[in-house]
């Protein structure tokens, strides 16, 4: 049952665990983090990186991608069966940056995947440690969510680009398991389902035969995951209909698009986890910190504390602003791409500005970029307060939905009202109300109409001082409601294209 996911904490999904108590969960998550750290130290030794180079976020991304590629079984199999010129299916690599005579140089490294797998397993007591791999995938996904706005992907499937706040996890690979499914936004799930249905419409054999049976199981599983994210009975009932359809087609696409729009006000519950780059875990392990013994949580104070004391560097292009680059990475580390900027600003203690106003491109450097003009700079990843990550979309008060917003998905459990422009959203609901789901549609629209933005619609704990590790004294910030706080919006962020 896909809905089982809701009964286990993210940490249990993260570590494929049975039901565990809090201490066991903290230990198993700590074990996972420690494994990533040990692997990173070993890779830095292999690549002969000095301490500074090892703390360079671009090197971290390359090393993370190498191990993810080494364990990508399906792609590895595909590459071996469909050899392409100049690509060795058994090797993996990427750009590694080193300081030579006061200048940054790019060096392309190539390793046997088998060798990378050996180093990874050795760092993880001989296990495949899938949880650690998923953790790195989620970090990459959070970085993509913060860097790119997925307008094109939305438009291609007939959805509105303003729905970008529903797109968390849209670049996560399929193989990211339960932990990955937990952090996917409603829009991401809808997009995956629509793509699947479209294939079925175009390819008569998609749902047929032995392969079709597997496809069908995958389809129903995805429907169940999405259903589990919705918090109102009517939205869930519509998902049941989409799932049970004998031959999914345009009617289902319509229903899914409708549901995605409804999630702008009747928010789904989407998990948030602070996944940090491997170059943060490595130095912590090297300094003698024992994550497994101390325990670790992805949704509490631990990642904040770790970032308070970490030194991470980044390459900076000539016309980029290092402070803006820092904000980008801070948001990615805290999984805050779709959080209200007012909440993020309060927690960070410095103003967090919209994507379109940031003078920075992505963190990764393309192979054709000129290295001569590159400098490096320290990323400022510290925060003024810490807050608990939430998984609630913040909408249902006793089945009566209150506010959402066209552009945020809460990350932090901080009480606020969610500003949203209801007229914009409701305008999207004129038109098609007939069809099998008309009564559910009517009910959903009614709930949306009764949503009042001025109510405090997100009951959260508040933020905490770093000295308050047990979260005993919440500080509830009061926000100025006049400036709405979405990060992407009327925006010119680059597009993510795989």
Curated annotation (Swiss-Prot):
Subcellular localization, as worded in the UniProt entry: Virion; Host nucleus
**Could you cite one Gene Ontology molecular function of this protein?**
structural molecule activity
Q: Which domain of life is it from?
A: Viruses
Any one GO biological process: viral penetration into host nucleus
Residue span of motif Unconventional nuclear localization signal: 1-18
Keyword Repeat carried by entry: no
One Pfam family, please name it.
Flu_NP
| Keywords for the protein's UniProt record, in alphabetical order | Capsid protein, Helical capsid protein, Host nucleus, Host-virus interaction, Ribonucleoprotein, RNA-binding, Viral nucleoprotein, Viral penetration into host nucleus, Virion, Virus entry into host cell
- Region Disordered: what ranges? 1-21
Report the InterPro entries cross-referenced here: Flu_NP
Q: Where is this motif: Bipartite nuclear localization signal?
A: 198-216
Posttranslational mods: Late in virus-infected cells, may be cleaved from a 56-kDa protein to a 53-kDa protein by a cellular caspase. This cleavage might be a marker for the onset of apoptosis in infected cells or have a specific function in virus host interaction.
Q: What Gene Ontology cellular component terms go with this record?
A: helical viral capsid; host cell; host cell nucleus; ribonucleoprotein complex; viral nucleocapsid
User: Has UniProt tagged this entry with the keyword RNA-binding?
Assistant: yes
Give residue spans, biased composition: Basic and acidic residues.
Answer: 8-21
Q: How does it assemble?
A: Homomultimerizes to form the nucleocapsid. May bind host exportin-1/XPO1. Binds to viral genomic RNA. Protein-RNA contacts are mediated by a combination of electrostatic interactions between positively charged residues and the phosphate backbone and planar interactions between aromatic side chains and bases.
Briefly state the protein's biological role.
Answer: Encapsidates the negative strand viral RNA, protecting it from nucleases. The encapsidated genomic RNA is termed the ribonucleoprotein (RNP) and serves as template for transcription and replication. The RNP needs to be localized in the host nucleus to start an infectious cycle, but is too large to diffuse through the nuclear pore complex. NP comprises at least 2 nuclear localization signals that are responsible for the active RNP import into the nucleus through cellular importin alpha/beta pathway.
User: Record's family?
Assistant: Belongs to the influenza viruses nucleoprotein family.
This protein is called: Nucleoprotein
Q: What is this organism's lineage?
A: Viruses, Riboviria, Orthornavirae, Negarnaviricota, Polyploviricotina
């Amino acid at each position: 049952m896909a809905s089982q996911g809701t009964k286990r904490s993210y940490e249990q999904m993260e570590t494929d665990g049975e039901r565990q108590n809090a201490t066991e969960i903290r230990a198993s998550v700590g074990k996972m983090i420690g494994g990533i750290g040990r692997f990173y130290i070993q890779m830095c030794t292999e690549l002969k990186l000095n301490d500074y180079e090892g703390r360079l976020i671009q090197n971290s991304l390359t090393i993370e991608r190498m191990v993810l590629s080494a364990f990508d079984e399906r792609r590895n199999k595909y590459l071996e069966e469909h050899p392409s010129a100049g690509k060795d299916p058994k090797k993996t690599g990427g750009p590694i940056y080193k300081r030579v005579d006061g200048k940054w140089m790019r060096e392309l490294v190539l390793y046997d995947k088998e060798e990378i797998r050996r180093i990874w397993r050795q760092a993880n007591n001989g296990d495949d440690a899938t949880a650690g791999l998923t953790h790195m995938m989620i970090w990459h996904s959070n970085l993509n969510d913060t860097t790119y706005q997925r307008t094109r992907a939305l438009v291609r499937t007939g959805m509105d680009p303003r729905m970008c706040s529903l797109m968390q996890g849209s670049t996560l690979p399929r193989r990211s398991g339960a932990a990955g499914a937990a952090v996917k936004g409603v829009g991401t799930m809808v997009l995956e389902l629509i793509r699947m249905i479209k294939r079925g419409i175009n390819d008569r054999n998609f749902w047929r035969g032995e392969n079709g049976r597997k496809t069908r199981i995958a389809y129903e599983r995805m429907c169940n995951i999405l259903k589990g994210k919705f918090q109102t009975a009517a939205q869930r009932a519509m998902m049941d209909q989409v799932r049970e359809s004998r031959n999914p087609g345009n009617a289902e696409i319509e229903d899914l698009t409708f549901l995605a729009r409804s999630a702008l006000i009747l928010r789904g519950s989407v998990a948030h986890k602070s996944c940090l780059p491997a170059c943060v875990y490595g130095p912590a392990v090297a300094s003698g910190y024992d994550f497994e013994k101390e325990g670790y949580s992805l949704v509490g104070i631990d990642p904040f504390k770790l970032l308070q004391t970490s030194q991470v560097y980044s390459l900076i292009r000539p016309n980029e602003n290092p402070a803006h680059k820092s904000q980008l990475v801070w948001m990615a580390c805290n999984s805050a791409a779709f959080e209200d900027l007012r909440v993020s600003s309060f927690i960070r203690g410095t103003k967090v500005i919209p994507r379109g106003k940031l003078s920075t491109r992505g963190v990764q450097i393309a192979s054709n970029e000129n290295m001569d003009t590159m400098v490096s700079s320290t990323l400022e990843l510290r925060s003024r307060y810490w807050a608990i990550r939430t998984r609630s979309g913040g909408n249902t008060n006793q089945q009566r939905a209150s506010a959402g917003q066209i552009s945020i998905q809460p990350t932090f459990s901080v009480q606020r009202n969610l500003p949203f422009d209801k007229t914009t959203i409701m305008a999207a609901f004129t038109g098609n109300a007939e069809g099998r789901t008309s009564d559910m549609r009517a009910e959903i629209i009614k709930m949306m109409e009764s949503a009042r933005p001025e109510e405090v619609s997100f009951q959260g704990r508040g933020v905490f001082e770093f000295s308050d590790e047990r979260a005993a004294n919440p500080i509830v910030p009061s926000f100025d409601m006049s400036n709405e706080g979405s990060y992407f919006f009327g925006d010119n962020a680059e597009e993510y294209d795989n």
